[in-house]
A protein has these predicted regions:
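Hydrophobic/aromatic residues positioned on beta-strands within the core alpha/beta folds
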Residues: 83-84
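Conserved acidic carboxylate
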Residues: 13
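Acidic catalytic/metal-coordinating carboxylates
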Residues: 39, 65-68
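The feature encodes the CheY-like receiver
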Residues: 62
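Acidic, metal-coordinating helix/loop segments flanking the phosphotransfer/catalytic sites
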Residues: 36-54
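Active-site residues of response regulator receiver
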Residues: 58
Length: 124
C-alpha cells in the first residue's frame, strides 16, 4: 500500500446491484473504490495499470471465468479476494492465491478479509 493513504480497491463484478452495495460498504469502512470492471478484458487492463492495493474478484463474470484476472493479480503480487457463490471449487488453479469469501457474505466478513490480506501484504 502507498504510505498512509486510504486502501484502494479494484472491484471486478458483473452484477450492478452487487457493485453498488460493495461501493457503499467499502466507502463506509474507510476504503476507496479505485475502479470497477464488469468484464475480464477491462479487469486485465486495470491490473496492468496497477493503480490499486487489493482486488475483490467475482469468480464468474456473466458466464466467463475470471481466472485470467486472478493469474494476472498473482503474477504482480497484488492480493485479492475471490467472491463466489461456489464454495471451495474456486480455491483451485488461478484462484488459489486469493482469499475465498462465499456469496452471500456478511459485510463484516468481507471487511475483515480485506483488512487481513492488506495487513499480510504490508508485512511481506
Amino acid at each position: 500500500m502507498r504510505g498512509s493513504q486510504v486502501p484502494r480497491i479494484l472491484v471486478v463484478e458483473d452484477e450492478l446491484m452487487i457493485v453498488l452495495m460493495l461501493e457503499s460498504l467499502l466507502l463506509e469502512a474507510g476504503f476507496e473504490v479505485a475502479d470497477v470492471a464488469t468484464k475480464v478484458e477491462a479487469a486485465l487492463a486495470f491490473v496492468e495499470a496497477g493503480a490499486f492495493d487489493v482486488a475483490i474478484l467475482d469468480a464468474n463474470l456473466a458466464g466467463v471465468s475470471s481466472a485470467p484476472v486472478a493469474a494476472a493479480l498473482t503474477a504482480r503480487s497484488i492480493p485479492f479476494l475471490v467472491v463466489s457463490g461456489y464454495a471451495t471449487a474456486q480455491q483451485n488453479g488461478a484462484f488459489a492465491a486469493g482469499l475465498n469469501v462465499q456469496k452471500p457474505f456478511q459485510t463484516e466478513t468481507l471487511i475483515e478479509a480485506l483488512r487481513s490480506i492488506l495487513s499480510a501484504s504490508a508485512t511481506e
